[in-house]
Amino acid sequence: MADGEHTLPADEELFEQPPLQQQQPEIAEPIVMAQEPIQGVSEDPQASEATHEAPDNYPVDHQMENQEFYQEPQIPEPQQIPQIPVFQPAAYNPPNYVAPQQRANNFGEPAAAADSRPLTEEEQLAAERPTEDTVWIDSDDDTDVEEAILRANFWLPYSDHNYDPPDPADRIILPTEGPFPCIAGLDEDCNIVKQWMPEDAVGPGSPGTQYRRNQQTGGGLPSTSVAPQQQQLPVRHNIQNRPMVAAQPFSIGGNQVEYGGIGGMDSRMQQRGVVRDGPQYRVMNDFGNGLPMRGQLPPRNSPAANAINRVREQQQQMYHQAGARGSLQQRVPAPAAPTPGSYQHIVNAVPVGGANPMRRVPPQARPGMIGGAANNNRARPIHVTRPMDTQEFEHPVAPAAAAPPRRVVDVAPHRMTPEQRQELQQMNRQRAAPQFPAAAAQRSAEKIVIQQRPGASSSRAPRPSMAQEDLLRSPTRRLSERVPQEHQTPVLEPRRFQVKVTDTYSTPIPKASDQLPAQLTEEDPPEESAAAAAPEDVPDAAPEDPPKGILKPTPPHRMTQEEKNAHFARLTTDKEKPTSSASILPQDAAPPHVPPPPPPPLVLRPHHQDETLAMVQSVFESKPRQPDTPKDKEAISKIADLLRFSADEFTGQSGSSAAARQRTVSGSAARAQTYQMHHQQQQQHHHQMPMDQRKRHSSGRYDALMGAMPLQQQPPPPPPSQFQHTDSIAHRPRGRPKGTRHPSVAVQPQRSGGARTLPPRAQTVAMSARNGANAKNSDSESEGIDEAAEESWTMRCHCGMDHGDGDTIECEGCKTWQHMACMGLTLKSNTSKYKCEMCLPRRLPVSKAEAAREQERILNRLRAAAKKQKRKSEPVEQKQKSQPSTSRKSAPMALQQQPAEPRVAQLNDYSKQASALLFGMEQTAGADTLLAESRLHKKARRMFVEEAVEALVTTDLVQIRQVILEVNGHVSMSNEVKRQPGGGNCIFMYDGLMKGTAGEDMGDGQELVCIDTKRKGNDTKFTRRSCVPNCVLKHVLGSNATLGIMIVATKDITRNTEVTLPFDADWRESEVELECAEHMKELQACPFESERRRFAAERHRAMDHKKREAEEARRADEERRRLEEEVRRERAAKTKQMDEAEKARLEAEKAAEKEKKAKEREEAKERKKMEVEASAAAAPESSNSITAREERRIQQAEEMFRRQEEEGKRKEARRRSKSVTPGVLEAAGTAAREDAPEASIPAPAPSPPASRRSVSRTTQPSTSSFATPTEPPAKNKRMRSVVPPKSEPASSAKRVRATTVATPKDTTASNDSRKRKSSATGKTPVAKRSKNVVPTSFGLALIEKELREQARDSTVLEMILPDYIMKEKRSGLLAGQSPDFSEVRAQIEEENRMKERFTKREAKKKAVEKAKEKEKKEHRKEPKKANEPGPAPKSEKAVEKAVEKVEKKPKSPQKPPAKPTAQKPPLKKTEEVDGIEREASESSSKESSVAPEEKKNPKKITFAEYNSRRSQKREAGECSTPPAVTRRGFIPSTEGEDLVNVELSAIPLDDHPSSSNTAPTTTIAPSVGGAPKPTSVVVKSPSTRSRTRGAASESVDDAPAEHSMSLQDRVFSMFGSTVDAPAPPPPPPASAETNSRRSRSTRWN
């Protein structure tokens, strides 16, 4: 716990005792008195002997100085109180400590002489003599022969090596455990028994002890006290000089509650705890050594106890009852008459003279002193549960009885063999009636059991049997033989008990003999143990004396299966032991043939004795031990369940009231009643067989013995209906409202087949949401029904039904119940925080109609199950009537109902978490009685202590540790309620549930209970807090999990005194001022308030620091996010750029790949075309005709070829150089007829395309126009070829279809003018077929061959038929023709030749493109001069160059500089016609670069152009007229289209339709910059052919520079400065409009 934290003081400081004041017989106010000083031991060896005789010496070993659990004594002088640097409230004295002393001349040793002489024998014996209050803790040697004896006699393999240390001297108590609290009055099973002490038997540390000793010895000896050394030690576990008490008058952490003198208890029952009416004992050193007495030095290892207080005469008892039987002193019997039933305890655990342990004979056990006058010993009576009706005598050499017959193996009855069943019956007949323990405290015996041992001085003397000596508890002693008679004072030996560590169990076991296996209890009569089996001869038993006490039992989790079986057998035999006078006699006085008498009626011990193990466990809480493994815990749980049910059965059949003994760990009254009903029904159903008259334990095993009570004496079972109803209440399904009856199960659980059903260890059932009551705690059926009737619950379900059958669940919000099936829940669903659809609106998986139908099915199923159960129960009644013990006409007897235990009213409300916590805790013994008394006798009420201030004020004198009032209200956990820290607002926080018996922390910090007294409470809500409280809160746990939190006084409180409580544990966390009752006017004077303010200031500073840190963290986080966002954006931008670059690269690669693939496709197409041409040329002619179907397919192919041709033309035009223009097609169309004679070619006349198609091939008249048929040809007829006549030019056809033949009929033209080889001579096939009638049908191969011939002879475009036509299934005649291998070779050669030609052509194209690129680069590098006209088109550059060469004129400054023209490779004469495009490109490029004097190669032109060209050549003379440059307004020649937006009136050089003058015109160019007038040159207008060629040479994609030049500049740039031409007319007024119109771009720009 942190420094400065306020905690409640220890119990001995809370409940401080007032001093002994003889002058004040009545105590009105608590008087503080310092305790007696505890003297240390002098280090001086010459110290006086009187110093060591001081009764208050506190010998301390120096090894215990730094032990964790060492408790230091207090310093009595107030002036020596050290200042502890911790926070302490007002009026609170910190504990004082005495420094541990060195072990020099300690334990009351006599003063040594100067020569350090050794002690004499008398002095040694005097030093070893124990005091009258010496307490020994039994501890055995691991190698003792006692284990073998007990194993041979009782089949109980004991072992104590798990707990005992190797050194016997340390077995009293380990140094690590701290001072051991001597709990007076423990029996062998560690149960607290009622005790009484003689009036002069007080502890050596109590007041008046030294005076009495001085009187007995004849005078007092002077004593010298030594000032003790002071040493400040830290507080150990907040246990500061805690008095070692046996029990406390009420519960602290689960201990029992007990009243003195309550009716039903023994009249001699002494109050336990720190009381003023009886002695209490405390060990004085770490090893349990005793104090010196009469100047004798006790042995080093002898324990001693010091009385905390003395018995005060004429003092009022704390809990005085009217029914008490007088005071303690009146109940003490005469000293000379020892009380029967008491034990003589072991005095010495280790012998003085040697290593062999020897028992010393007490003075009253010596020969000749039994019953003599010298026997004045007084024994402390310890009441046992074993009856003692006669005097017992045991002789050490008594003969041993024969071993009892072994019982048969615990086998299920239906699995027993006939021999086993017969043997079991025989054993049941031979055994005596079962004997149960009786309360010996309520009847007296004549004499005490004393064992005589005449030869005790010899170490080899015959030793008594272990059963006789250990059960008698009267060891022999030799010490009193050597002590003078005058020193033999009444010796009250501390009893010898066996310490059992039960910390492995979570709850105490009510019956000590059933909770731990294999241990001898006080209920075991010695003669039964002696007669059970004769002691076997043990080899090592004779030479040594037996050790002290019996061995410690083996822990349950370490027992083997054989040990468990032996323990179960012993549990049964414990209940068979006789208690009559004849059976208690020694074995020689009770013959075996005498039948034992029936057992007497029994009176059980009080309830408080059942909780004894909890106190013993709390003593050893601080003992370090190894944690249990999961396997050990599982074994412990199983064995604990078995033993708990055995304890229930044992106590239930012992003759006591079932309602009073059903408060056990293993089950509640309802559960025990259920078991008894079922058990009695089984007995009634099966008692016709003798072997079936056995008791079946709840633990699942069968008891082979008959029941303790005859079957006729057992109460009849209740009716089956009541049994079923009680079972349904106790075991209702999860979520069912309490009180609703579950329908009967269809089939009862079968328990045949030998199956052993083990109920769960902690069987929890559903708890009520209102008052937290559990059905299992109800004592009867009527009680459960009453509770159900009192409980109010509301069923509001989705289905609309309000019945409570089936599985239901409660809403935590509105506290209403719903059917789980209607809510869509199952038993496996998580319903920890369930809320209905009203509190938590949501869509339910089940609709209302489905929910109603489901509930109807559930109700029908439950009704059917109830009817089925009713039918099944009928044969049971018939079987019961057929029993021989009952008449057929007689009806079965009604089952009697067990009497109900009075219920305790529920004055508190409990939350669910609080109810779950309380149901897991054990009930406190006597809690109901204490709660009833506190509610009946209220010692305080609310009053006005100031104006408008109410408080709780006492109305009577309240003594220390008395209950003032019970706090009532709503009990909940600390996390379920909003409260003010420190206390207030009528809410009390209680942390006692986390405290153990000694006040140490037992919980995990989450078991803080809060009681809200605002809504439901009593006058305790007005209790105020104070820094000097006079009360505290304590709790008890009553029946039905009733938590009673009471206000208990920590000091004597007078009448009309305000009751105050300490602040809650979290008072430092309060943000408001504490309301201290002592400092209401000056809160600053309250130390708690000052401390709270300091903590609040620190807390505020810490909060401010946290806020600053949080703000800094937030800002840093924002900055970090901002930087991250910037980095993210930068990265995104870079990534986007990289993605775009990558995308562009991929697109470029894709485009390049696509272009490459397109080129490859074109090349493949070209190659395929050549292959088809070669194959068609080699294919033989066939006279077969085609069908109408083939004709239609040809027409479809023809249309597709036309579209493919157009698409190919468009693609080729985009890839061509700028020299290829749309005019090439026209030039190519007219170039085929240039070589025709001028006389045979008439003037060109346009004709529509339709007329050309409809001209007949066979009958063609010699007219100037094509013959046009009146109707188009039918689809099923052969397409007719249209052949133009001789007089009609073929240049008008822009596009020629595959079937259109544009060749002239006259084939007499010279062969020199035609560029073909194979068809240069002779007539063409078309001309031949035109003279004859073409048959209606012919073969497909013939058509293909004819088309290819026409393509070579005429201007018909070449095309390739698709593959599906070529590969189409042909007729039988064509299919039968076999291919010729010579044709295949020729085809291969042709393919190679075509590939070579294609390669050359591609190289030529690349060279032309390279020259063009070079020319463009040079043009960009040349700077543009002033007044220099724009660059002329490519076709004009050649004209300018030619003009310069012809006229030999000097350069003028106005003439643009000549630009170098790229040298093109010389053209080679082609052997064949490659195509129209190639011819056009070659002709245009050749004309632009050739000189005027060169003779041009003949071209395919029309006859009209041919004639005009010849006439122009004659007129020009030696030079040829250069081709005219394309000017603004000229449109490329297009067939069938009109000129748009053409204005030629202002252009005198052109052949305009408005001017018929063909004379030469002289044009004078203007002078530029004062240059001399050049000579005029007569230039004729260019011909139509020249304009056509100029227009054809203009690129569509290139906008000529002449468009932005004036007419004079264009003429000057074309013809130079010597051009003589008439001046142009003045411009019109709207010159701007004209210029704008001219500068407007057209669709050809």
UniProtKB/Swiss-Prot annotation:
Localisation per UniProt entry: Nucleus
Compositionally biased tracts (Pro residues): 592-603
Protein name as annotated: Histone-lysine N-methyltransferase set-26
Family recorded in the similarity comment: Belongs to the class V-like SAM-binding methyltransferase superfamily.
Signal peptide boundaries: none
Task performed by this protein: Histone methyltransferase that mediates trimethylation of 'Lys-9' of histone H3 in vitro. Involved in transcriptional regulation. Plays a role in the negative regulation of lifespan and in heat resistance. Together with set-9, negatively regulates lifespan in a germline-independent, partially daf-16-dependent fashion. Together with set-9, plays a role in germline development and maintenance and might play a role in the restriction of the trimethylation mark on histone H3 'Lys-4'(H3K4me3) to target genes specifically in the germline.
Tissue distribution: Expressed both in the germline and in somatic tissues.
EC number: 2.1.1.355
